[in-house]
Amino acid sequence: MIIPLQMSLIPLLKLMKGGAILFGVTIIPELSLNGTFVAVWFAHTGFGLPLATFLLRDFMMSLPKSVVESAKIDGASHLTTFFKLVLPLSVAGIAAFATFQFLWVYNDFLVANVFMGIKPENLVVTSHVAQLTVGNYGEEWHLRTSGAVISMIVPLIVFFSLQRYFVRGLIGGSVKG
């Protein structure tokens, strides 16, 4: 969360393309992930983990301790307590994080272009919308505008389907005063 995303893209691109060698010793072997969706998934997972940790930790800390303590008294293990009590009670926080992460990944232009390149078969939705502007007679803004409106349909469906959890998930981990 401290280092800006843009500063870490080139080192990550070098890592995905050729691995990591330090003083002649191969630390991470050549991954050859450049130009694949796996590289974009790794990047988005790595950049999304701090937000997930921040949001879900605060949300889970706001859950009532008496519920967890009663599960321990009943003889539930840590895994049983987590999967049968904490996780179902955290659905609102998980849905809020899932909404944030989906909207960030879906609307991402920079990370996808850096790791995927400009091959037509590897372009994501935002890259396709950006390429709609150049025509034979100049820029065709009506194509870009209509492409942007059409590309907003999927995020709107996701947001409206998770909307009831969204506010509860954000408020659930906040400080009560």
Where are these regions (language model features)?
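A hydrophobic, multi-pass inner-membrane permease signature
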Residues: M1-G177
